[in-house]
Amino acid sequence: MSATPDPRLKAETLTIRTLTGFDETVRVLGSKSYTNRYLAIASLSGQETVIDNALLSDDTVYFSRAIETFGHVTCDIDHATARIRVTPTGRPMRAPSEDIFVGGAGTPLRFLISMAGHADGTTIITGNARMQERPMGDLLKALPALGVDATAVRGNGSPPVRVVGGSFKGGATSISGAVSSQFTSSLIINALRAQTDTEITISDDLVSKPYVEMTLAGLAEMGVSVDRDGYRRFTVPSGQQARGGQVTVEPDASGMSYFLAAAAILQSRVVIPGIGAGSHQGDVHLVQALERMGCRTEVGDDSITVTGGPLRGIDIDMEAMPDVVPSLAIVAAYAEGTTRITNIASLRVKECDRIAAVTTELRKMGIDVEEHSDAMYITGGTPHGAVIDTYDDHRIAMTFAIGGLRTEGVVIKDPGCVAKSFPAFWQTLDTLHPDLESTK
């Protein structure tokens, strides 16, 4: 994909043109979750690391620049080759003189809170208006037992967060897993540089478990072992050093989901190369959900193929793959019967309240949606065109763009918000249908 910025990212609206079908191989950019994890691990390894097929998006660029402010590494980004080179400077980690601002990047902010515990001095970490509403309290409560003083500046459990660092000694702590698995991943990764063994006990059920599996897989690939008792306890032995070298990021399963959804609703065929049965990304399991809804699927070692068919509603617990709930929801809008998507309370505290956003925008398109605190019941029908509000949320924009491939008159407001995770989304969509029209 060209490194030249897509002018559609600057448009106020984007009108999606319909198409009748397609049979295409679509190459999806690297995983955002893995790129963030490799960046964090590499920055703590003390060795040069090259991250190939990295996702270069708003989130990962914010994270790269934030890591550099501690002074111990440089992160050289090559947009032409989708590569990030992380190189130690030989200097110790020190708190930056300026606040660290990460925009809407939730995973980087949560990783940085723990990382700042290794940096001498006081670090302030903050983000955009929505980020300043998102909960960090469970992580802030867990860090003092490991020697790190981390507090919400306004006392509300949300950013800005103040961290007094140089003190991440390790030891034992407990943390709730009910709000976000990113807190657990943050502690596990940053325990890599703790002075003693670090034991992390999960005090209740852990949501979004596959994301912790991705953290453990990334650490293992870079030579770090973590002892575990299921999802109840994780122990990171001290004295380990992550090895540098070269790592390759597999395609992003969340980004892939939009093209699987397109194949489903258009009774078309799509092949996604570079990702297969061995992936630790929980969002890969959307394939099984689409199969239950009537699609034909093939999951090989290095590719995934989905062919759409007559769609029917299903009942499904999506707790393990919350990021692809919007993708499933747009498919449900075209399915016969009702799709009941449950156990998705975590969507209330994403870039927007995604349960409310998906419900509102599907209703605009004439679809009956029953909204619950942690669920959506979507009764399929014949959606009509609508002007879609995107709530500064990349996943809402991409989801409803897929609906616009089948339904005439779908207009996406603020199409540039996709840059958070998939800046080449509109160009990738062109591989299915080249005729997209932007209006100013």
UniProtKB/Swiss-Prot annotation:
The active site is at 323 (proton acceptor). Its EC number is 2.5.1.19. InterPro entries: Enolpyruvate_Tfrase_dom, Enolpyruvate_Tfrase_sf, EPSP_synthase, EPSP_synthase_CS, RNA3'P_cycl/enolpyr_Trfase_a/b. It comes from Streptomyces coelicolor (strain ATCC BAA-471 / A3(2) / M145). It holds the Pfam family EPSP_synthase. GO terms for molecular function: 3-phosphoshikimate 1-carboxyvinyltransferase activity. NCBIfam families: aroA. It catalyses: 3-phosphoshikimate + phosphoenolpyruvate = 5-O-(1-carboxyvinyl)-3-phosphoshikimate + phosphate. It is found in: Cytoplasm. Gene3D superfamilies: Enolpyruvate transferase domain (3.65.10.10). Transmembrane segments: none annotated. One of its GO terms (cellular component) is cytoplasm. Pathway: Metabolic intermediate biosynthesis; chorismate biosynthesis; chorismate from D-erythrose 4-phosphate and phosphoenolpyruvate: step 6/7. Catalyzes the transfer of the enolpyruvyl moiety of phosphoenolpyruvate (PEP) to the 5-hydroxyl of shikimate-3-phosphate (S3P) to produce enolpyruvyl shikimate-3-phosphate and inorganic phosphate. Keywords: Amino-acid biosynthesis, Aromatic amino acid biosynthesis, Cytoplasm, Transferase. This is 3-phosphoshikimate 1-carboxyvinyltransferase 2. Monomer. 3-phosphoshikimate binds at residues 32-33, 37, 180-182, 208, 323, 350.
